[in-house]
């Protein structure tokens, strides 16, 4: 059948073929001879490429390669993902001139940082009489619908959010998989493709001047992106969930924190949209229901289960809080963030924290793991974030956010900024409270008693026995010589007196709290139990 134009499926964050309503919309006219053009555009910002480290870029490229491989496999080589470099409006205008576009279909990117990009394409579509189709599938609910249902304002507490989405109803089930076998694809003129900077094959991170950070030798896990990998990991994760449900645990990653084993988290694949959040949500809930029914047959009553996907709901909450707030990632102009007078940026302290050179082994191990792998256990994220802000260095959370956005595989703008505001007490129920500050030394002894994790990522301490590995400064000069770890030479001195810093910070928080007659509105949990469901809270404090 001769083509009568084409529909574009423009991949940005939803880097998958399953549960992709935008892809289904782009395929809806295939029986009328409308071809499909799958597109990804490196515009310097989309998919988090404005501030990106090597592991994040490699994960993105893996994900794009996986889409291309699946398209070619499903269509006997007729279909492929077209990966361009340039300005989206210009590329779509040129494509329209070449093949006449009927629709440009996208998965909604609800965060305000994408508004300008998407509005430029809406404007182009109006000008050229192209349908612009936007589908909600990166979130469980449309954040704008949540705000509308809540009376036009974002629900400031998690409990308010739960109440609002209960009014809306359960999130939609995943859509059917797209049938690509009988789809037609456009063959573009090679010279035209070159003029639009179409990659003949996917580039490497180095093409974008993105290089490794000299920590790769420490990597224990090399994460691989892509839908195929995401679905394999989902199967493994569901086995873990089932085992946990059958033992009465509903949040296995929080109930049994383990910083040593390979992580079972799906968050990186959710962040890039390699895994549908709706598929994850319903897979877990359907699994729990089946386990519950089998238990009932045996005469065992399984209660609870309301929080089995609590982390996904917190994700929705942060998206909703940010959707109408373009300043959500900073203090200035951010109405829900408390303006804590953090210390003037100290580049020496900041760089020591970024590179894992603080003199505190757990902090250093975690920060080096982040650089090497792009990953940190949830507990370690909270620990290094607290250390940077209210629990140690008294530096603004904005510095930590930018570092995480660059290196953390699963860091997205809304959720990462929300977490940083929360951990730093910039948006917290117990206003400006620093009474509980996790001690990185005590926590390390609890989570890593033999120093296995520390020695993996801080090899300077490889020969140090476990009684000193978490406090190497306690070694005598003779012991430092014996274990080949001279403090200040092989491993850095502590950059702060942590006990004094915590006391100073607590007083600063208390003083600021007393100065606020009317606390500003800020996103927050409704009670302490919600805090414990979100964080894994250590009960070891400075």
Swiss-Prot record:
Function: Blue light-dependent regulator that is the input of the circadian feedback loop. Has no photolyase activity for cyclobutane pyrimidine dimers or 6-4 photoproducts. Regulation of expression by light suggests a role in photoreception for locomotor activity rhythms. Functions, together with per, as a transcriptional repressor required for the oscillation of peripheral circadian clocks and for the correct specification of clock cells. Genes directly activated by the transcription factors Clock (Clk) and cycle (cyc) are repressed by cry.
One GO CC term, this protein: nucleus
Inducing or repressing factors: Expression is regulated by light and circadian rhythms. Under circadian regulation, expression is influenced by the clock pacemaker genes period, timeless, Clock and cycle.
Pfam families linked: DNA_photolyase, FAD_binding_7
Main location as per UniProt: cytoplasm
Record annotation: effect of changing residue 337 to A: Accelerates formation and decay of the FAD radical
Names of required cofactors: FAD
Note: Unstable upon light exposure. Light induces the degradation of cry, likely due to conformational change in the photoreceptor leading to targeting to the proteasome. Appears to bind 5,10-methenyltetrahydrofolate at substoichiometric levels.
Top-level taxon of origin: Eukaryota
Record-linked PANTHER family: CRYPTOCHROME (PTHR11455), CRYPTOCHROME-1 (PTHR11455:SF17)
Family matches, as PROSITE patterns: PHR_CRY_ALPHA_BETA (PS51645)
Free-text domain note: FAD-binding region regulates cry stability, cry-tim interaction, and circadian photosensitivity.
Organism: Drosophila melanogaster (Fruit fly)
Keywords: Biological rhythms, Chromophore, Cytoplasm, FAD, Flavoprotein, Nucleotide-binding, Nucleus, Photoreceptor protein, Receptor, Repressor, Sensory transduction, Transcription, Transcription regulation
Name of the protein in its database record: Cryptochrome-1
Phenotype upon loss of function: Flies exhibit poor synchronization to light-dark cycles and show no response to brief light pulses. Mutant abolishes rhythmic tim and per expression in photoreceptor and glial cells, but not within certain pacemaker neurons of adult brain.
GO molecular function, one term: FAD binding
Family: Belongs to the DNA photolyase class-1 family.
Cofactor note: Binds 1 FAD per subunit. The bound form of FAD in the inactive state of cry is oxidized FAD, not reduced. After activation by blue light the FAD is in an anionic radical state, which would be paramagnetic. Green light, which reduces levels of radical intermediate, has an antagonistic effect on function.
Family matches, as InterPro entries: Crypto/Photolyase_FAD-like_sf (IPR036134), Crypto/Photolyase_N_sf (IPR036155), Cryptochr/Photolyase_FAD-bd (IPR005101), Cryptochrome/DNA_photolyase_1 (IPR002081), DNA_photolyase_N (IPR006050), Rossmann-like_a/b/a_fold (IPR014729)
Name of encoding gene: cry
Quaternary data: Interacts with tim and per; promoted by light conditions. Interaction with tim irreversibly commits tim to proteasomal degradation. Interacts with l(1)G0136/CG8198.
Compartment(s) where it occurs, according to its Swiss-Prot or TrEMBL record: Cytoplasm; Cytoplasm, Perinuclear region; Nucleus
Tissue: Expressed at higher levels in the head than in body and it is more expressed in antennae than in legs, wings and mouth appendages. Prominent expression is seen in cells of the lateral brain, which are close to or coincident with the clock neurons. Abundance oscillates in a circadian manner.
């Amino acid at each position: 059948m001769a083509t009568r134009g084409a529909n574009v499926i423009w991949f940005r964050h939803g880097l998958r073929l399953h549960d992709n309503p935008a892809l289904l919309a782009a395929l809806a006219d295939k029986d009328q001879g409308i071809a499909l053009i799958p597109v990804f555009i490196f515009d310097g910002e989309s998919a988090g490429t404005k501030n990106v480290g090597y592991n994040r870029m490699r994960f993105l490229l893996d994900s794009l390669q996986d889409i291309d491989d699946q398209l070619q496999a499903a269509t006997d080589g007729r279909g492929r993902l077209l990966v361009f470099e340039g300005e989206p409006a210009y590329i779509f205008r040129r494509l329209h001139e070449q093949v006449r576009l009927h629709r440009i279909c996208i998965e909604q990117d609800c965060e305000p940082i994408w508004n300008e990009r998407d509005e430029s394409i809406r404007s182009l579509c109006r000008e050229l009489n192209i349908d612009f189709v936007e589908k909600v599938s990166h979130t469980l609910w449309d954040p704008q619908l949540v705000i509308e249902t809540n009376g036009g304002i974002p629900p400031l507490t998690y409990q308010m959010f739960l109440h609002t989405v209960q009014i809306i109803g359960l999130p939609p089930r995943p859509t059917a998989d797209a049938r690509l076998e009988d789809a037609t694809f456009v063959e573009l003129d090679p010279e035209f493709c070159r003029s639009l900077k179409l990659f003949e094959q996917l580039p490497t991170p180095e093409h974008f001047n993105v290089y490794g950070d000299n920590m790769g030798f420490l990597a224990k896990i090399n994460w691989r992106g892509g839908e195929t990998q995401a679905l394999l990991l989902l199967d493994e994760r569901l086995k873990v969930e089932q085992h946990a449900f059958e033992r009465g645990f509903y949040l296995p990653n929080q109930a049994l924190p383990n910083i040593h084993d390979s992580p079972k988290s799906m968050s990186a694949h959710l962040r890039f949209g390699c895994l549908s959040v709706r598929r994850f949500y319903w897979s877990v809930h359907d699994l729990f229901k089946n386990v519950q029914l089998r238990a009932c047959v045996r005469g065992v009553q399984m209660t609870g289960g309301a929080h089995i996907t609590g982390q996904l709901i917190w994700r929705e909450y942060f998206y909703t809080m940010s959707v109408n707030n373009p300043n959500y990632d900073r203090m200035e102009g951010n109405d829900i963030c408390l303006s804590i007078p953090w210390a003037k940026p100290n580049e020496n302290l900041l760089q020591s924290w970024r590179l894992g050179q603080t003199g505190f082994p757990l902090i250093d191990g975690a920060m080096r793991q982040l650089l090497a792998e792009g990953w940190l256990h949830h507990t370690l994220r909270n620990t290094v974030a607290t250390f940077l802000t209210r629990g140690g260095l008294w530096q603004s959370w904005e510095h930590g956010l930018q570092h995480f956005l660059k290196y953390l595989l699963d860091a997205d703008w809304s959720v990462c900024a929300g977490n940083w505001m929360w951990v730093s007490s910039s948006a917290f129920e117990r206003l400006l409270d620093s009474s509980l500050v996790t001690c990185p030394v005590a926590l390390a002894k609890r989570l890593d008693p033999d120093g296995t994790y520390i020695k993996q990522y801080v090899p300077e301490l490889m020969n140090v026995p476990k009684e000193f590995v978490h406090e190497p400064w306690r070694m005598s000069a003779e012991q430092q010589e014996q274990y080949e770890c001279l403090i200040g030479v092989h491993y850095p001195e502590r950059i702060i007196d942590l006990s004094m810093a915590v006391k100073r910070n607590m007083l600063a928080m208390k003083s600021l709290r007393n100065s606020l007659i009317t606390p500003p509105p800020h996103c927050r949990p409704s009670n302490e139990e919600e805090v414990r469901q979100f964080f894994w809270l250590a009960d070891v404090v400075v």
